[in-house]
Amino acid sequence: NACAPMGEENAERVCAAAGKALGCRPEDVVVAATGVIGQTLNVAVIEQGMPELCGAAAHTAEGSDAAAHAIMTTDTVKKELAVETVIGGKTVRMGGIAKGSGMIHPNMGTMLCFLTTDCAISPEMIKSALLETVQVSFNRISVDGDTSTNDTCCVLANGLAGNPVITEKGPDYDAFVEALRALCVELAKKMASDGEGATHLITCTVTGARSEQSAETIAKSVIGSALTKAAIFGADANWGRVLCAMGYSGEDFDPDKVDVAFQSQAGSVQVCAKGRGLDFDEELAKKVLTEHDVTIAIAMGEGDGACTCWGCDLTYEYVKINGDYRT
């Protein structure tokens, strides 16, 4: 809340309006918001439109598609996905819609994600599953390094799949988490790919680190580096930007053991071995970096820790979008 007491009051008014229109308790309504920080919400407009909004809701694929479109702001593409798995001999379905293009650097940017499932699972277990999943999906993306005040990711389960209720960790819980993780990772990648003004999805893989946490810190530092992002935009294989971002990540590592390569559908180019630059084919490197999906592969040579994070390039369009975002 960035609007003092009025922010909380407005949220309660939205809950009351939604509860009345849907025939449920206001406390069963979750409010998610995006927009200019500190600018008060025009609740009267929402209250006026709530009956029509709720009346138009449809429990169909078309309804989900409409909702995915409705939450878009500076997004250029809608982000929705569905998966199926088998739990306890029953087919379980999960679906998700999300929005997020700028101010994406989640720490649970402005990102919103709404997940639904028909799995029968206890509140305690679904909370545990969501926490596990968010850590390895949405918390591993970055568009611009700015963490929003309003990050939201929620999951709703109605239990209609008919599987034995998941009340403890075990094979059924693991299957649920695996499906939820697959869903959220793909939604997270869609967000990174659709970063404001972005022309590239950047995947950074770190292997051979001292721990998974160390690998994550290094990978997030690289995808968050403005200079690395700008280099990818320009298809410039400037691997020094990568090592620089690794260095200021705060993690302790031996730079003389680091290997770096750029990869895409066009091929792979190793640019650094044991911390030293290599002679490489600049023309091939440019082809590799011209592809939409680009991977920065980093091998640390120090342990078994590994992590993958996702980001995007930094373009002129990003500056244009955010230079006059409020006006």
Residue spans for each PLM region:
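A structural signal for small-residue-enriched, beta-sheet-centric alpha/beta enzyme cores
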Residues: 1-327
